[in-house]
Structures are given as C-alpha cells and as structure tokens.
C-alpha cells in the first residue's frame, strides 16, 4: 500500500488545507493526552502522597513524591533517543502511536496501584516504575510531535501552527488541573485522599484510546528517501549537527526550568509559601493556565514576523530581570487577584519560549535527524533542569533557603539569553 505523505508548501488547495488541519488536530490530541496523564501526577500528589509513602510531615511526603516526579524525567533522554530514532528511521506516525500506548499503560498502573499499607515498599517502587514508563513515553512524544507539527505547517505561518504543540501541552496540564478542581468541589476531602485521586489517572487512560484512533488517521510527513539514508536517526548523524544540539540544550534548560516553576510547582508554592488554601491556589492556576494557553498562537504568529531569535532574546532578558521580583512578591501575596496577575506576568514572559519551542528546534536540524535532534536535546535539558525544579525548590525551602531558588532560575535565564544571541537571524540558516 502506498504511503500517504504531506509536506509544507505555501501553495495549498482546499483539500491540502483540510488535511493539514486534521494533521494538527490528530497530533495535538495525542499530545494533550500525553501531557494530561503526566501532569495529573503533579496535581494529585497533594492527595496521594500519604498513600504510597510512610507517615511523616507533609513537606517530607511531598518531597518524596517530587523525587518520583523528577525520576520520571530521567527516562526522557532515553525516550528522546529511542522514539527520535524510530521517527527518523521508520516515520513520525509510528513513533507517535507507540508513545500514546505507553502513556496509557503507565496511567492504568497508577490508577490501580495499592498503597503502602497494603503492599509495603512495593507501593513506592511500582509507582516509580510507572512514572519511569511515562517518562520514557513523554521523552519520545515531545521531539516527534514537535517535528511533525513543524513539518506539516505552512511556510510563513510555521510559528503560528507549531505553537499548537504547547497549546495542547498546556491544555493537557489545564485539563488535569480542571479535573482536580471539579473533584475538589464534588467530593469530600477524605474521599479524595482515599480513592478519588485515582479517577484522573483512569480518565487519562480512556482519553488515550481516543487519541490513538485519531493518530491512526494521520499522514506521514517524512519522506521514504530521507528515512532510507544511512545516517537517518543515528547518533553519528546527530554529531554532525552538534552545534545545534548544544544550543538547544542551553535555551531548553532555562525554558523548561521557568515553565515548570510557574506551572506545576506554582500551585504548591501558593499553598506552602503564600499560605493560600489548596482550592484557591488551584482556581488561580486554572485561570492562569487557560489564558496562558490562549496566548500561545498569538506569540507564535508574532515570531513569524519578528523571528525566533528576537522572541528568544525577549524571553531570556525578561525572565532574567523579573523572576526574582515576581517570586518575591508572591511570597507575601494575600489577594487571589494579585496572585493571578503576578503569575500571568511570569507566564507571558515564558510564552516567548513556549510558543516557538518546537519550531525553533526543528528548524535547526536536517530532516534525517530532526526528531532525534529535537527530542534528545530537549529531553536531556528537561530531565536535568525541568524535572528537578520542584525537588530543588522544596529542598531549598526545607533548609530555609527558598530565595536561592529564585536566583537559580534567574541565572539560567541569563544562559538562555546568551545562547539566543548565537541563533541565526530571521530567514537565515533554517532547515524547514
């Protein structure tokens, strides 16, 4: 059977346009489910920490769950390599189908897993194993979906179309948070802590089945001739593009750290540091993430006009200047509206990175190692800096040095700014 492919072209028929829209929807649906499943863990950890870990104070149990969260990130480089190779050697579509199946399995395991009182140390061990499995899946999802959405996008509007990767990434995070908020308002706290937290994990597994069906309908964007190249999906081929690889490591380190600081960790920060009720903090983050999601296409479209380099310079400079003031102000904030405003200021800055994250990286690598280059470089930096964000923040808080974390984020923003200075100017040196 002949393989159906779709590639970027500025001259489109109405049929081509429909196919591209369907491709964006199909790829995005799987991306949303992947990140919904992954973020459910973070948002539900306040409720299940005591289930899987021995009795102790709240900070200690949260620290242990954050450690498992970070451990999931350690599998991302392996996932980035494995799924990147599959995508470059056998096709983007096959890689995306496999990653959704793996995430579904991990969520089902957590939804059904007995607690510490029932199976003892097997509980945290199996929880860790499930998270490692999910980390492997997400490590492969990012690079492949970013590559796919970048390749299917139309020339001159690539920033706009590719921004939908983070629309669905944030959408998955938002949906996870929204489900938690609904459960908080419809269930007793005791029931939520006892068994209600399992509902989002089960829901994620069901949604994965829908995403799997949608992705089966997708066209392939890579060409058979490219996949047949000897260096396709190989580390040797990636080594020839090591400058791009190192640069992606640099700005992803800061981008991931800022993203996880102001999204997943922020809910805990508002509760444990600002002293807000968990329900109030969840409401603030739900509203903030919704607005954050909506502005991605706007700033992605802006990058089509001003260039990716300018967008990244805006991110690096603004994050370096305003991270400490924003986090310091949030320490003592009492008004939910003020907290929302401060969080939105931070997320607006982060949007200059998130909206173009996928297309920026994809434009830096040739087709035969594009998924591998995007996925592996992102996964390595994300595992080290993004995955450890909560753990580092909570560790510093536990020893009374919480403000040191603010300066750590600021330092990485400076690194992103310096690396961005080395990016090609608009229209020069792009691979797509």
Swiss-Prot record:
Keywords from the named record: Cell inner membrane, Cell membrane, Membrane, Symport, Transmembrane, Transmembrane helix, Transport
Segments on the Cytoplasmic side according to the record's topology features: 1-32, 84-95, 140-162, 215-243, 301-309, 361-373, 424-432
Disulfide cross-links: none
Periplasmic side: 54-62, 117-118, 184-193, 265-279, 331-339, 395-402
Pfam families: MFS_1 (PF07690)
GO terms for cellular component: plasma membrane
Transmembrane segments: 33-53, 63-83, 96-116, 119-139, 163-183, 194-214, 244-264, 280-300, 310-330, 340-360, 374-394, 403-423
Subcellular location: Cell inner membrane
Membrane topology term: Multi-pass membrane protein
Single GO term (MF): solute:monoatomic cation symporter activity
Main location: membrane
Family statement: Belongs to the major facilitator superfamily. Metabolite:H+ Symporter (MHS) family (TC 2.A.1.6) family.
Function: Uptake of alpha-ketoglutarate across the boundary membrane with the concomitant import of a cation (symport system).
Protein name, entry field: Alpha-ketoglutarate permease
Organism this protein belongs to: Escherichia coli (strain K12)
Gene this protein is translated from: kgtP
């Amino acid at each position: 059977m002949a393989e159906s492919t779709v590639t970027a072209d500025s001259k489109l028929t109405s049929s081509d346009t429909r196919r591209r829209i369907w491709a964006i929807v199909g790829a995005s649906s799987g991306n949303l489910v992947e990140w919904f499943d992954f973020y459910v863990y973070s948002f539900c950890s306040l409720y299940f920490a005591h289930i899987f870990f021995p009795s102790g104070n709240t900070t200690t149990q949260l620290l242990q769950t954050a450690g498992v969260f970070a451990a999931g990130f350690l599998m991302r480089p392996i996932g980035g390599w494995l799924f990147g190779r599959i995508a470059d050697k056998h096709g983007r579509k096959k890689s995306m189908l496999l990653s959704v199946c793996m995430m579904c399995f991990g969520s089902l395991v957590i939804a059904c897993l007995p607690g510490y009182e029932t199976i003892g140390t097997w509980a945290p061990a199996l929880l860790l194993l499930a998270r490692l499995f999910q980390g492997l899946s997400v490590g492969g999802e990012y690079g492949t979906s970013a590559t796919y959405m970048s390749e299917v996008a139309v020339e001159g509007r690539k920033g706009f179309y590719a921004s939908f990767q983070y629309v669905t990434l944030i959408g998955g995070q938002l949906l996870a948070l929204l489900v938690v908020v609904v459960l908080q308002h419809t269930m007793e706290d005791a029931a939520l802590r006892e068994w209600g937290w399992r509902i989002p994990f089960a829901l994620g597994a069901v949604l994965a089945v829908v995403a799997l069906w949608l992705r089966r309908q997708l066209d392939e964007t890579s060409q058979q001739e490219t996949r047949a190249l000897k260096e396709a999906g190989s580390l040797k081929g990636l080594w020839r593009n090591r400058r791009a690889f190192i640069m992606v490591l640099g700005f992803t380190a800061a981008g991931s750290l800022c993203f996880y600081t102001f999204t997943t960790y922020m809910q805990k920060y508002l509760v444990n540091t600002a002293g807000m009720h968990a329900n109030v903090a969840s409401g603030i983050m739900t509203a903030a993430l919704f607005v954050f999601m909506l502005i991605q296409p706007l700033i992605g479209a802006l990058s089509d006009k001003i260039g990716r380099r300018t967008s990244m310079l805006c991110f690096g400079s603004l994050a370096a200047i305003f991270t400490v003031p924003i986090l310091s102000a949030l320490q003592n904030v009492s008004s939910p509206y003020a907290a929302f405003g401060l969080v939105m200021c931070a997320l607006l800055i982060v949007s200059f990175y998130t909206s173009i994250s996928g297309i920026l990286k994809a434009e830096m690598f040739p087709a035969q190692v594009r998924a591998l280059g995007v996925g592996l470089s992102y996964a390595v930096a994300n595992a080290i800096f993004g995955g450890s964000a909560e753990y580092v923040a909570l560790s510093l808080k536990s020893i009374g040095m919480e403000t040191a974390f603010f300066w750590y984020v600021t330092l990485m923003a400076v690194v992103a700014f310096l690396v961005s200075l080395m990016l090609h100017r608009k229209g020069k040196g792009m691979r797509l």
